[in-house]
């Protein structure tokens, strides 16, 4: 990696939550890349003081060569916050600030100014309370990048789970799963496992939608009418697919030891297993974007803000994975 390709942009997320704490904790060690934090400088300096941690900020200079990040320092891409932040207390006046940091970081990642984007947790409810329609990071970045399809995947060192659908009510899931959508999702998953994870021939295990994967049509017809035909077409294109398998049996070592990724049909089908197995060590990845995006696997934890007790493990894992994905993409 060279110059701007040695830069990762970070958004701390909700200012009243643990995001700023975790970014400051990241700064307490050396990093081989430049960490450019898109945030209000005063917010970070105040929070560092509250945490009794050293922090020096240097302003981001796009035209200068990227520098490895030294412990105790961060590079700042400034965005001014609207109202004073009280740790643990949401303020609707700061919702536009949160969205502005996401937009600024996303635009820099799209342009190639940054090699990857790593996000801290946001509070979706307070953003919507401000009158800003916001489903989540995944959908926001997809819309801003003009991507008609992206794929949400969570990963630990041992397991990767991608989703055929994301933040939908359960009632809406069957209608959202079509042969076209599965073709798009699985093609993105297969491509990004190759290009961003360095897996030359990924093997993807696919969950059925219904109990027992439909039990031959006795517990639903989506497998027979949609999932099985879609997988057959994709296999003809050279994608290694196993399934559809019942979700309650797929998540066993005899299957997972061979799986480079699992495709779950909906959010709560696959993610509870992954989070139980590796909560605090999991990373949220958005596949199909024109840039690398990783994130923590937890929420804003308002009650922990400025207490010094927040666990930085997931943020460190997300940042390390982003660096690894950058290296894989450059090979």
From Swiss-Prot:
Q: What is its main location?
A: cytoplasm
Give the GO terms filed under biological process for this record. pyridoxal phosphate biosynthetic process; pyridoxine biosynthetic process
Q: Which GO cellular component terms are attached?
A: cytoplasm
Among InterPro entries, the record links this protein to:
PdxA, PdxA_fam
Cofactor: bound how, per the entry note? Answer: Binds 1 divalent metal cation per subunit. Can use ions such as Zn(2+), Mg(2+) or Co(2+).
Q: Which domain of life is it from?
A: Bacteria
| Cofactor names | Zn(2+); Mg(2+); Co(2+)
Membership in a protein family: Belongs to the PdxA family.
Name the record gives this protein = 4-hydroxythreonine-4-phosphate dehydrogenase
Source organism (scientific name): Yersinia enterocolitica serotype O:8 / biotype 1B (strain NCTC 13174 / 8081)
Name of the coding gene: pdxA
